[in-house]
């Protein structure tokens, strides 16, 4: 397994520590989620000096979410950052938008947005991806919802996040439906509840979820991994996980977790 540091899992730490932790724990690369207050060129230099490949950039600007008229121009700045980082993949997650009228209408809006920005990414030599998102009002979660968009936007691909998919449907079935579009992976773990509880958030299935460290929740990630095709096992896997109780340092946690996951 190509284990990847997801930089937002160490949000608030200096970028030097994020990079050094990834290297010391044997990770195979990093996905810069936003720029952590630095320029893309600065992040690229830190990674180059440390010998840490940049496998992706996740764009976090929110103009499209807030219906800003300059959303496409804002995307171009995220694309420029991806090019500077030499990130082969740029992921723009379809989070719920302000003023959502319906899930179907929002999927249509996202389809139009991705159709406009995907050719820009292709021209820059960057693969643009979407992911399922796991909020109670997320409009793109299940496989058929993803396919509704993907089939209308040539060149758009999927960052497959089984945890987010599981907020609505069986992630293995979704994997089978989406596998021709998958170019990147995110792994996370959840605790599930059928009733509201402190720290749990509502999701589309009607259940409630809470973040937990990979291996301590209810997501069958190891089993899913065992059933994935070899071509997908060769893809980068963001470790979208940390000690959510704050009891262990990232270095301590990842030193133990990374070797375990590489054995899957």
Give the role of each language-model region.
Residues 1-3, 7-23, 48, 86-87, ...:
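Histidine-acidic metal/acid-base catalytic patches
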Residues 67-160, 167, 251-252, 260:
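Active-site acidic/histidine proton-transfer and metal-coordination neighborhood
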Residues 44-62, 111-121, 147-153, 219-222, ...:
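Alpha-helix-loop-beta-strand connector modules within alpha/beta enzyme cores
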Residues 31-48, 97-102:
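Glycine-rich, proline-tolerant flexible connector loops at the mouths of alpha/beta enzymes
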Residues 1-13, 61-72, 100-106:
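Active-site mouth loops of central-metabolism enzymes
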Residues 6-10, 33-35, 59-63, 95-97, ...:
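Active-site beta-loop-alpha junctions enriched in small/polar residues
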């Amino acid at each position: 397994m190509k284990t990847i540091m997801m930089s937002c899992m160490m949000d608030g730490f200096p970028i030097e520590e994020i990079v050094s932790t990834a290297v010391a724990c044997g990770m195979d690369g990093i996905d810069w989620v936003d720029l952590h207050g630095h320029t893309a060129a600065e992040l690229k230099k830190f990674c180059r000096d440390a010998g840490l490949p940049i496998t992706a950039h996740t764009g976090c600007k929110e103009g499209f979410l807030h219906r800003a008229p300059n959303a496409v121009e804002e995307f171009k700045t995220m694309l420029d950052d991806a090019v500077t980082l030499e990130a082969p993949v740029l992921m723009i997650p379809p989070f719920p938008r302000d003023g959502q009228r319906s899930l179907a209408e929002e999927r249509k809006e996202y389809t139009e947005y991705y159709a406009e920005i995907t050719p820009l990414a292709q021209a820059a030599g960057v693969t643009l991806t979407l992911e399922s998102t796991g909020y109670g009002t997320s409009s793109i979660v299940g496989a058929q919802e993803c396919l509704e968009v993907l089939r209308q936007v040539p060149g758009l691909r999927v960052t497959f996040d089984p945890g987010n998919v599981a907020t609505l449907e069986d992630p293995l079935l979704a994997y089978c439906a989406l596998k021709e579009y998958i170019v990147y992976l995110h792994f996370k773990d959840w605790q599930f509840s059928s009733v509201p509880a402190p720290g749990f958030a509502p999701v589309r299935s009607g259940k409630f979820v809470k973040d937990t460290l990979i291996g301590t929740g209810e997501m069958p990630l190891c089993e899913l991994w065992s059933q994935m095709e070899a071509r997908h096992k060769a893809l980068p896997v963001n470790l979208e996980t940390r000690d959510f109780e704050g009891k262990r340092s990232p270095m301590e946690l990842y030193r133990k977790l990374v070797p375990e996951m590489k054995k899957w």
